[in-house]
Swiss-Prot record:
Guanine nucleotide exchange factor (GEF) which may activate RAB6A and RAB39A and/or RAB39B. Promotes the exchange of GDP to GTP, converting inactive GDP-bound Rab proteins into their active GTP-bound form. Involved in the negative regulation of neurite outgrowth. It is found in: Golgi apparatus membrane. This is DENN domain-containing protein 5A. It comes from Mus musculus (Mouse). It comes from the Eukaryota. PROSITE patterns: DENN (PS50211), PLAT (PS50095), RUN (PS50826).
Length: 1287
């Protein structure tokens, strides 16, 4: 609606604010359109960069490649009535541009001159809206000067054309034929020609209504009847001023829930406005959108809009652009599009397509150029919709809307019931080239794609052949809906108890509109039925909340997503990050009571309350079952009641107090109206005082009163928009003068907006990653989920693409970032070839050390080009956009994103060549701040490349570090190694003897978890003391250290020939290219201190019972926490079981406590004790001396597991066997049984001191209770831990 509350109480009472006439000003003559200056500027800059400019006159700004009849000329607002109203100031520039977006058009008697209607919206910078409705028709040009000027232009055009195309006969350059599509010159001159002696010249003129609300059908009817009065042979009953005066001053704006009838020139006009508890006013035909695009394309476009992609609609018809844009935004209820919204983009604002912000714009097509001729600045995040050719291009990685199949089916059933083919004209990108060869006129009756002209009945007969429709019909029949001829002549849902006062076709449009909208609204009501539970109300006052809004979390996204079904997550996780969702939640926080609520929010909340009441559901109880819409009948009935019983009939048009004889009627010409009677309304508002209370019911006075008191809400909205700008510094293009300074200022706002968005996005990602935000708000420890992380990274990639697309000289490829990288790579290779660049920075160190026992791995060189090559070698990535995103992910994982981009932008000559002066990447200060913000990502660890590209081949580099003092060079056995990760494990890799460093390639293993290392015990000296093993991912640079510090050899330590080592990721130092990987380990859990060399359990420092209890409690607590996290957040369970502070180590300390010291230098291990206990219980079983059945089962299980571990073919040693037994006991929930069994075993008395923990019944019972907490969890063991055992 129109914004502001200024202008007094009459502001909301009028149906229309202005009547406007636009057209040719015969006094100023023919002027080139406003685009000419801008075109010259753009084309001149392209010419400097080697692009081919169009040929234009430097003096006139005219394009001689186009015939004068095809050119557009400046239109002007010729008249407006009244001059101004306080509550809706007249915006002459905007109205002029949008009434005639391409300026004036000329035609001759040979051209079709049908009148064209279109609606438009003027969105102010504060987000408020005014609606316009324009009817464009053609009038004969009576001015001799204009006709002579057109004739002169044709002479100039023909002369210029002959000069330009003279070389064509000699086979010269043919670039000038672009507009003529290869037509010979003489033929082209006859086409669209004008001869003053034999042709009649016509020029476009536009009549327009500017209104506070979008009553499209009523305004169209008003304008069409006015035009009919002008073109009719007979004059209208009254002067035109009477009808225009009536609609401006005597037709009121219906209040919510009311209907209105008023008179046009030839017939009554009816409009109705939904009540405050219904869906908001929407007066465009949804049917047309589904017929033009088809259900599938509408859903894809709808999803793109919800995720705030850039959307560009493309059509020859302005009204189609408007209908599609308004329909898509209306279907979003209760969410509202928050970004640039220009459904009809005036030709003079084409530079706005360069905007690096989300937008929804409509671009007019001339009907001749196809998609390939459109040079769009950025396409990586663009949804392009060719409305006339029923074709849509989607951004990559578009997630599917939740329950899409059932949703599509429900919508299709409604469409079929109204005779609308649900399968529209669906085409995928592969058929784009074919589409370009099909003329739009041929598509009108193309039976193959479902775009059927004619009545619904004929459409139905033709669609019977269609397989998809047949399947949908079968689905509908199963639901009990009759499809006999689709009831095209009579609507089964119409109510026979009353007669509506509009024609049947109009009623069916109302019914289809409300049914489709109710179904879409129901989806959001079901999906967000519990949203209020997750809104975090601010604890501070409003002023503080506004000030710190960007640092606050106002919706518990992690908890909300954890409640959602898995298939919903890809869409919902991205949707929760959008501006429209943020604004929706802001509105919720600002509205403390129902009276204060935003009207849209009030309607949505009432529906949510109704659903909860009907389903008797609690906030935590949700279902993923698809629930159909049940509110259609009620909504339909409300509309039908308003149309059957009109609440008010406006005053009929009447003779005005005006001079007789002025405005002489002349068929075919819109008369000059008498401004003295149209510029002022009634002197005293008697009509309002007399009729308003009687006709509009009493409660509507309350409604008007609340509208006066809404200043507070306007202020609230202003605060919200300021607080949640999120980088969209400029929300709407100002439709005003287009001087270079204005364009420069607009671009500067874009630059500032991009920088702000970058700052907000990096901060959001860091806060989520570190989990600080939720902790500060008192929600405990919250980690980001994999889905959320992917969403935020995808959002960062979108931002980078928009930054790299801003101010491009010439678009090359769909990804501006990847295009820039390729240019940089090409430049570097050229310099390398010429020898002007050193190769040392990009070569990997391939040295192969044999016997150096240092724990230092040769550094991995930093190289932007090498990282590009890694991406280029991945065959699974086919597109430039995909490659750019993969490169960003890899750079983030390597903590090199800021550094790489700084290196990329350091080639200033390349940047100047690729970008215009105003581009973000050429604003030095902002660019530096941008790179600084990206540098903050180095503070956290991302695995966004490793976890996404799971099937690619990765080279891994291994370094084995033996003890410096013992057993290095004399080792004679043949070693082997096997590496395991979260995504898989390698086969056993044989290591050449005396080789300590090697590289191999295998499918991505993910984060590495364990290394199994061993040897075949061959040769004279088969004893090996290994300090640690290091493994590096050669693509991501992640280096893992697997400490060992134990012997591998018979008769040494516990006699093990192989060991399972649990690893940790080493963090990298800031200058990774200058320092080796001698780095501290990443902290895996609180108070973890890793020793460089692990020592055998017998020699570990002894802990007291309190410390042992604490370590077991912490180990078990770590496992419990692991399982309480969402599955995608969980770390390595292997580390929690077998790591330094894992369960195995803690239980090892418990069994070591009070263990009797061995004599005569003989080592005794815990496994020796367990074997003796097994022998004891087996003997008892043989003698049938078992106390009870329970005890018998536990003893038998214990013996079975110990025997199975002892019989494993692996040479894992006694400590390895103990580790395996503990892991198996944890998996099968038997540990607490075994502890109780061993505590009562007589063997314990022989092998343990009296002070031992295992002999203290109180401590044992406490230990059993702790271990029992693991019973509820399903523990899955890494295959490396239980390899070779089948139990």
């Amino acid at each position: 609606m129109s914004g502001g509350g200024g202008g007094g109480g009459s502001a909301p009472s009028r149906f229309a604010d202005y009547f406007v006439i636009c057209g040719l000003d015969t006094e100023t003559g023919l002027e080139p359109d406003e685009l000419s200056a801008l075109c010259q500027y753009i084309q001149a800059s392209k010419a400097r960069d080697g692009a081919s400019p169009f040929i234009s006159s430097t003096t006139e700004g005219e394009n001689f490649e186009q015939t004068p009849l095809r050119r557009t000329f400046k239109s002007k607002v010729l008249a407006r009535y009244p001059e101004n109203v306080d509550w809706n100031p007249f915006d002459q520039d905007a109205v002029g541009m949008l009434c005639m977006p391409k300026g004036l058009a000329f035609k001759t008697q040979a051209d079709p001159r049908e009148p064209q209607f279109h609606a438009f919206i003027i969105t102010r910078e504060d987000g408020s809206r005014t609606f316009g409705f324009a009817l464009t028709f053609y009038e004969e040009v009576t001015s001799k000067q204009i006709c002579s000027a057109m004739q002169t232009l044709y002479h100039m055009h023909n002369a210029e054309y002959d000069v330009l195309h003279a070389p064509l006969a000699d086979g010269g350059d043919q670039s000038g034929m672009e507009d003529g599509e290869g037509i010979p010159g003489t033929k082209l001159q006859r086409f669209n020609s004008y001869d003053i002696s034999r042709d009649t010249l016509y020029v476009s003129k536009c009549i327009c209504l500017i209104t506070p609300m979008s009553f499209m059908k009523a305004c169209r009817s008003v304008l069409q009847q006015l035009h009919q009065a002008v073109t009719s042979p007979q004059p209208p009953p009254l002067p035109l001023e009477s009808y225009i005066y009536n609609v401006l001053y005597e037709v009121p704006l219906p209040p919510p829930g009311r209907s209105l009838k008023f008179s046009g020139v030839y017939g009554p006009i009816i409009c109705q406005r939904p009540s405050t508890n219904e869906l908001p006013l929407f007066d465009f035909p949804v049917k047309e959108v589904f017929e033009l695009l088809g259900v599938e394309n509408v859903f894809q476009l709808f999803t793109c809009a919800l995720l705030e992609f850039q959307i560009l609609l493309y059509s020859q018809h302005y009204q189609r652009l408007m209908t599609v844009a308004e329909t898509i935004t209306a279907l979003m209820f209760p969410f509202q599009w928050q970004h640039v919204y220009v459904p009809i983009l005036p030709a003079s604002l084409l530079h706005f397509l360069d905007a690096p912000v989300p937008y929804l714009m409509g671009l007019h097509s001339n009907g001749l150029d196809d998609r390939s001729k459109l040079e769009l600045p950025q396409e990586a995040n663009l949804c392009f919709v060719d409305v006339d050719n029923h074709f849509i291009e989607l951004p990559e990685d578009l997630p599917q809307f939740p329950n899409k199949l059932e949703f599509v089916q429900e919508v299709s059933e409604i469409l079929m019931a109204f005779g609308v083919p649900p399968e529209g004209n669906l085409h995928c990108s592969e058929s784009a080239s074919k589409l370009k060869r099909i003329r739009a006129s041929e598509l009108v009756s193309d039976k193959r794609n479902g775009n059927i002209a004619g009545s619904p009945l004929h459409s139905y007969e033709l669609l019977k052949e269609n397989e998809t429709i047949a399947r949908l019909q079968a689905l509908v029949k199963r639901t009990g809906v009759s499809l006999e001829k689709l009831e095209v002549r009579e609507d089964p849902s119409s109510n026979k108890d009353f007669k509506v006062q509009c024609d049947e076709e109009e009623l069916r449009i109302y019914q289809l509109n409300i049914q489709i909208r109710e179904v879409f609204a129901n989806r959001f009501t079901q999906m967000f039925a519990d949203y209020e539970v997750f809104v975090i109300q601010p604890s501070q006052d409003k002023e503080s909340w506004f000030t710190n809004r960007e640092q606050m979390q106002n919706f518990d996204k992690a908890s909300f997503l954890s409640d959602q079904p898995e298939p919903y997550l890809p869409f919902l996780s991205r949707f929760l990050e959008t501006q429209m969702f943020a604004s929706f939640i802001d509105n919720k926080i600002m509205c403390h009571d129902d009276d204060d609520k935003d009207p849209v929010l009030r309607v949505f909340d009432s529906r949510v309350d109704k659903i909860r009441l009907l389903n008797v559901r609690t906030p935590t109880l949700r279902t993923s079952m698809y629930q159909k819409c049940t509110t259609v009948d009620e909504a339909e009935k409300a509309i039908e009641l308003r149309l059957a019983k009109i609440d008010h009939t406006a005053v009929h048009p009447h003779l005005l107090d005006m001079k007789i004889g002025q405005g002489k009627y002349e068929p075919g010409f819109f008369p000059k109206l008498q401004s003295d009677v149209l510029c002022t309304g009634p002197a005293s508002n008697k009509w309002t005082k007399r009729n308003a209370p009687a006709q509009w019911r009493r409660k509507d006075r309350q409604k008007q009163h609340t509208e006066h008191l809404r200043l507070d809400n306007d202020q609230r909205e202003k605060y919200i928009q300021e607080a949640r700008n999120m980088g969209s510094t400029i929300r709407q293009p100002k439709l005003s003068n287009l001087s270079p300074s204005v364009i420069a200022q607009t671009n500067w706002k874009f630059v500032e907006g991009l920088l702000k968005e970058c700052r907000n996005k990096t901060k959001r990602m860091l806060v989520e990653k570190m989990g600080r935000e939720a902790v500060e708000l008192g929600h405990g420890e919250v980690n980001i989920t994999g889905v959320e992380e992917n969403t935020l990274i995808a959002s960062l990639c979108d931002l980078l693409e928009r930054i790299w697309s801003h101010g491009l000289q010439v678009k090359q490829g769909k990804s501006a970032l990847w295009s820039h990288l390729l240019h940089y790579q090409e430049n570097r290779q050229r310099k390398l070839t010429s020898g002007s660049l050193s190769t040392s920075g990009i070569l990997l160190d391939s040295e192969r050390r044999k016997s150096d026992a240092s724990a230092v791995m040769s550094p991995l060189r930093i190289s932007l080009i090498q990282d590009m090559r890694h991406i280029q070698n991945i065959g699974e990535i086919k597109t430039d956009v995909g490659k750019a995103r993969a490169w960003v992910r890899l750079s983030m994982e390597k903590k090199l994103l800021s550094r790489h981009l700084k290196q990329l932008l350091s080639d200033h000559e390349l940047t100047k060549k690729l970008y215009k002066r105003y581009a973000f990447l050429r604003c030095d200060d902002e660019k530096e701040q941008f790179l600084y913000h990206l540098l903050s990502f180095n503070a956290v660890d991302y695995f966004c490349f490793t976890n996404v590209f799971t099937t690619i081949l990765i080279p891994y580099h291994i370094l084995i570090v033996p003890s410096k003092k013992l057993g290095g060079s004399m080792f004679t056995a043949n070693p082997w190694i096997c590496i395991s990760g979260e995504l898989g494990e390698t086969q056993i890799l044989q290591i050449p003897r005396n080789v300590l460093e090697m590289t191999f390639e295998c499918q991505n293993l993910g984060k590495l978890t364990t290394v199994q290392i061993g040897h075949d015990n061959s040769g004279l000296y088969a004893k090996w003391l290994v300090e640690c093993v290091m493994v590096r991912n050669e693509v991501t640079g992640h280096t893992y250290k697997f400490p060992c510090g134990r012997w591998l050899g018979k008769g040494m330590d516990d006699g093990s020939l192989e060991r399972v080592l649990v690893g940790e990721l080493l963090t990298s130092l800031p200058e990774v290219d200058e320092r080796p990987c001698r780095t501290p380990p990443l902290q895996q859990s609180p108070s973890v201190i890793r020793r460089l060399v692990t020592i055998s359990p017998n020699n570990k420092p002894k802990l007291n019972t309190g410390q042992i209890q604490e370590s077991i409690g912490e180990a078990v607590n770590g496992i419990v926490k692991h399982f309480h996290k969402p599955e995608k957040e969980r770390g390595s369970l292997t580390l929690l079981l077998c790591g330094e502070c894992g369960l195995v180590s803690a239980l090892e300390q418990a069994f070591q406590h009070g263990f009797k010291s061995p004599r005569l230098f003989k080592n005794v291990f815990i496994w020796d004790f367990l074997e003796k206990a097994q022998t004891y219980y087996e003997t008892l079983e043989q003698n049938d001396v078992v106390p009870e059945e329970n005890w018998h089962t536990r003893a038998r299980n214990f013996c079975r597991f110990v025997t199975a571990v002892n019989n494993t073919p692996r040479n894992i040693g006694k400590d390895g066997k103990f580790q395996m037994l503990v892991c198996l006991g944890a998996r099968d929930h038997l540990l607490h049984h075994w502890i109780a069994l061993l505590a009562d075993c007589p063997i314990t008395a022989h092998m343990y001191e009296d002070v031992a923990l295992i002999k203290d019944h109180t401590l044992v019972n406490s230990l059993i209770r702790v271990l029992q907490t693991l019973q509820e969890f399903n523990i899955t063991l890494d295959t490396s831990l239980v390899k070779g055992i089948d139990i």
